[in-house]
Amino acid sequence: MTVINTLSNALSSLYNNEMRRNKQAIIMPSSKLIVNVLRVMQKEGYVGEFEYIDDGRWGKILVQLMGRINKCGAITPRYSLTYREMISLPDYIRRYLPSKEIGVIIVSTPKGVMTHKEAARQRTGGIVLGYVY
């Protein structure tokens, strides 16, 4: 079976396991982008520790869930935003987050994967990947 969007599959797997009240989630196939998104989610306190398991094929990621994810998902198509658009992100916040203070939009920038708040602080634009709250 062909996997079209691995990031979308990973985020929906996290959300589904969270809704089933599981303590762990296994994400496969893994990629560097998924690991970087998980680091951002871990720094924001949405997931616990995670580890890469090499199975000789694509690899798996075992993620410890903390019960803090209400909703998460990938934003498709992946829009490119400039710094000025990153500061005034009201369309994306209104569409994907319940309020300005709750949740984050995950952005891939030239300085790495980070939240939309960090990207605005560092004065950089990037590509919108997903959201979590």
From Swiss-Prot:
The keyword rRNA-binding applies. SUPFAM superfamilies: Ribosomal protein S8. The gene is rps8. Coiled coil: none annotated. This is Small ribosomal subunit protein uS8. It comes from Metallosphaera sedula (strain ATCC 51363 / DSM 5348 / JCM 9185 / NBRC 15509 / TH2). NCBIfam families: PRK04034.1. GO terms for biological process: translation. It holds the Pfam family Ribosomal_S8. It comes from the Archaea.
